[in-house]
Curated annotation (Swiss-Prot):
InterPro entries: Formyl_transferase-like_C_sf, MPG, MPG_sf. GO terms for molecular function: alkylbase DNA N-glycosylase activity; DNA binding. Keywords: DNA damage, DNA repair, Hydrolase. It comes from the Bacteria. The keyword DNA damage applies. Pfam families: Pur_DNA_glyco. Its EC number is 3.2.2.-. GO terms for biological process: base-excision repair. It comes from Burkholderia cenocepacia (strain HI2424). Belongs to the DNA glycosylase MPG family. This is Putative 3-methyladenine DNA glycosylase. Signal peptide: none annotated.
Amino acid sequence: MRRSKTAAPWPGTIVPRAFFNRMATEVAPQLLNKILAAADGRAGRIVEVEAYAGALDPAAHTYRGKTPRNATMFGPPGHFYVYFTYGMHWCCNCVCGPDGAGTGVLIRALEPLHGLEQMRAARPPRTRDRDLCRGPARLTQAMGIGGAQDGVDLVGARDGFAIVDDGMAPPADLAGGPRIGIRVGQDLPWRWSVPGNRYVSGAVPRI
């Protein structure tokens, strides 16, 4: 697998597009321990993810086809799909699979690594450091991710964000568990997290 030659905003190597050009259920557990890095210095280690499998997944935004809201998910892999939910929160996904697949990985939690002062300023006063990025809406707020970042190229690193491999391998022998906050597809074990990490939004029971 070839690596991107674009300079990474965090020590390591930008994860190449080929990494994302696979099924979301393959990409998701391998995203664990990668770094979500911003050009302004904010960075966190990915410790919790969920996969959404497009037309095969009734919980996916893309299950019923392409709309203006979810169009980014049908585009090329290695881009952000950022959506607004509950009338108040942003969530970010990595688009996976070939063009038109409509699949992706929701980043659910980060372990903050750098730029904590900026993260604290972006979150409500008196937020504990443990809670800065513990949950999908919290992490987008802490990292400065919103609607303007929908479609950002995470591989080119020219749009302010990248996924970086700093050499830490994903956890071995991971078991998936049920996804959170969905009404359908709860039986699919497509949520993964770093075992024992205190920044995970909740335990991942096995199905």
